[in-house]
């Protein structure tokens, strides 16, 4: 992450929408990220004296990214939380647009934007992720929308994780949602805990989507899908889809689509 961490931090600091708290988590990086972050924080404190800045490095790798998510929720003091992953980036208008969607509907608990993908050298690979997300070619993501959480899960999120990258998303820390419980449960998943967490949160509110690619998701060219990883992913997908069936009112047709999707995997 050392190659991208400064760009990531700056992409947060340079937002057109004001931020009040910056929490940087490091999960025992094996590179020089900690030293780079410490030096950057000294600079931040001089330039942004009113910004609350926390740096929390782990002494031992947690082994599960969702433990870090939980720490972010535990440590943050604001009403909204943006988990900005270390190797991603974004438009400086990202937060401005995402936060507007909360203002349009006070029941929105998750607000996100479309994402483009880029490589290690910031070369754009895909202008958006609609081809990945909209597997049944519904056209759902061609326009911005606000959906009731249950409807979104029963018609879209039940099939696949339609929120491809957590960096594209801001959560409202609604006091009626037991984020702590759901994140502890999410840690039992190695690959699909984000999907599990989203469907749990959406039991309690609505979701908003901005069609513009305001989030920049970095794809690592050396990432490899191993057979064992594929098998684990399939196992977790089946588990999450079963949980959705138990907690949501899926139509007969949608349940059949779930079965067909499992077979194609």
Describe the predicted segments one by one.
Residues 1-4, 29:
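Donor nucleotide-sugar binding loop of glycosyltransferases
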Residues 229-237, 255-265:
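Non-catalytic, C-terminal membrane-associated alpha-helical segments of glycosyltransferases
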Residues 10-57:
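Acidic donor-binding segment of Leloir-type glycosyltransferases
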Residues 93-135:
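Conserved donor NDP-sugar-binding/catalytic core segment of glycosyltransferases
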Residues 81:
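Short aromatic/hydrophobic "clamp" motif used to bind/position activated sugar donors
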Residues 85-89, 114:
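The conserved acidic donor/metal-binding loop of glycosyltransferases
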Residues 90, 132-230:
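Conserved nucleotide-sugar donor-binding catalytic segment
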Residues 57-76:
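Glycine-rich, basic loop-to-helix element that forms the pyrophosphate-binding segment
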